[in-house]
A protein has these predicted regions:
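Helix-loop-beta segment of a Rossmann-like dinucleotide-binding subdomain
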Residues: 89-102, 139-181, 202, 338-342, ...
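Dinucleotide-binding Rossmann-like beta1-alpha1 core, especially the glycine-rich loop
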Residues: 39-139, 294-295, 307, 313-316
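Glycine-rich FAD pyrophosphate-binding loop
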Residues: 10-34
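C-terminal catalytic lobe of FAD-dependent flavoproteins
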Residues: 152-161, 169, 304-437
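Central beta-strand plus flanking loop segment that forms part of the substrate or channel wall
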Residues: 43-45, 240-267
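Flavin (primarily FAD) binding-site architecture
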Residues: 223-238
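Short beta-strand to alpha-helix junction loop
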Residues: 62-75, 103-110, 157-177, 186-188, ...
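Helical element adjacent to the flavin cofactor pocket in flavoenzyme catalytic cores
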Residues: 154-220, 231, 417-431
């Protein structure tokens, strides 16, 4: 997020001084690290939680269209940076990877069929295929069928325009571009405070080695510290952060690097979450390409840790509690008992039980091929609510001061996939007096800026074709 915002600002105001502070010795070691996330270019091509079923049996596609629109904005920005030489070879961070939805059981097959009918004619979902034929599905992803009962009803959708994104590599590329063009990067720097001083913000930090204190004054501060953004915004004292809390959820995946297994799965395949389970529980079997090497990941399996970062402290959750967010946090917990039950179930699950979840996707999976990895921490947003006292939301939220001089990002998925539209929204919120003069430059970077591609099928086709060509991915 920080690297994206910095890169956009460098295009708009090349004369502005940009400083980046990183708690670890280099960027992208936390949530952006490719093994701390699934690397899905989230565009709702296969993620079934974006297309819920209405009470009348019809399929709601508004959320799917919104997420896809957002990812198209990110694609346009990345394509612009590649075309202008600001990003290197695109295959170093993004690769064409078919996106599939796969379900079993008569009710789920019926749902997926109706979802396909609702999406297939939409301009952002062109090329979506559907099949209930085991041999067709085997051709799409050979690992899904062997060992499966022939009597089991199954269905899948597939679209070639999906992507696998190495957000760690992308973050490093963007940061390198910034430092090559005048930005100053300080690693091993633990920011300890952000305080207002008249019309400036004083950012205080200590070296992780030696604990030497430093400070710098800035006219604008963006807090893109992942799970630690909440605490730093609380320290800033802005009233807009009052009532916000965070609930950390850790994640685990199973991974295999066995080339014989990996070669038989060239897609990201998303299933359907169990009834009553939270969106984060959607199981998926993913092709990952990291540093040019393919692997497979399956998960996520949820866990609990009070840390707000993978390298954080076990005191993080308790340190985030304030008088103004205590009621929202308690209320959100009381109204999300299904999440609590889900987490307890995941914590109690044995290794064999977890592996059985993989075998629902890949019946012939061999435990000898797979090993467990721990993914990043996701701090879900808790916010005050007039009716319920507090609610837990699965998404991201920009929190900014009234005068727009400080802002931060809270939350998790879809996260990095929508970094560009989120940061463009932040610019509109924090720099309302400049946004009009920036529009020509923003439109050069993101041709659809200020419009919706879904309103203009011809323009949508042109934009997606152009970005696919620039990024070397499928249309």
């Amino acid at each position: 997020m920080s690297a994206t915002l910095g890169t956009i600002l460098k295009q708009l105001q090349p004369d502005w001084e940009i400083r980046i502070f990183e708690r670890l010795d280099q960027v992208a070691l936390e949530s952006s690290n490719p093994w701390n996330n699934a690397g899905t270019g989230h565009s709702a091509l296969c993620e079934l939680n974006y297309t819920p079923e209405r009470a009348d049996g019809s399929i709601e596609i508004a959320s799917a269209v919104k997420v896809n629109e957002q990812f198209q904005v990110s694609r346009q920005f990345w394509a612009h940076l590649v075309d202008t030489g600001k990003l290197p070879e695109p295959s170093s961070f993004i690769n064409a990877t078919a996106h599939m939805s796969f379900v079993w059981g008569a009710d789920n097959v019926d749902y997926l069929r109706r979802r396909f009918e609702a999406l297939k004619d939409h301009p952002l979902f062109g090329g979506l295929e559907y099949s209930e034929d085991a041999e067709v599905i085997r051709g799409w992803s050979p690992l899904l069928i062997p060992g499966r009962a022939k009597s089991q009803p199954i269905a899948a959708t597939r679209i070639a325009a999906g992507t696998d994104v190495d957000f760690g590599a992308l973050t490093r590329h963007l940061t390198r571009y910034l430092t090559d063009n005048g930005a100053e990067f300080t690693g091993n720097a633990r920011v300890t405070n952000v305080k207002r001083r008249k019309d400036l913000w004083r950012v205080s930090w200590r070296d992780e080695v030696g604990q030497t204190p430093h400070f710098v004054d800035a006219r604008f501060v963006f807090v893109g510290a992942g799970g630690y953004a909440l605490g730093l915004l609380q320290k800033s004292g802005i009233k807009e952060i009052r009532g916000f809390g965070g609930f950390p959820v850790s994640g685990e995946f199973l991974r295999t690097d066995n080339p014989e297994v990996v070669a038989r799965h060239v897609a990201k395949v998303y299933g359907k979450a169990s009834v009553g389970s939270p969106p984060m529980s959607v199981p998926h079997l993913d092709l990952r390409v990291v540093d040019g090497t393919p692997s497979l990941m399956f998960g996520p399996y949820a866990g609990f840790s009070p840390k707000f970062l993978k390298t954080g402290s076990v005191l993080d959750l308790f340190a985030s509690i304030r008088w103004h967010n205590l009621v929202p946090m308690v209320a959100a917990g009381a109204s999300n008992l299904s999440l609590v039950r889900y987490l307890l179930g995941q914590l109690a699950a044995s290794r064999n039980t977890k592996f059985d979840a993989l075998r629902e996707f890949m019946p012939n999976a061999d435990p000898a091929d797979w090993y467990r990895i721990t993914a990043g921490q996701r701090v879900q947003v808790i916010k005050k609510d007039a009716k319920k006292g507090g609610v837990l939301q699965f998404g991201t939220e920009v929190v900014a001061s009234a005068d727009g001089t400080i802002a931060g990002l809270l939350g998790a998925s879809p996260g990095a996939s929508t970094a560009v539209p989120i940061m463009l929204g932040l610019l509109e919120k924090c720099f309302p007096d400049r946004i009009e003069s920036w529009k020509p430059a923003l439109s050069a970077m993101v041709p659809s800026y200020g419009t919706l591609l879904s309103d203009d099928p011809k323009r949508a086709d042109d934009v997606m074709t152009n970005t696919a060509t620039s990024l070397g991915i499928a249309r």
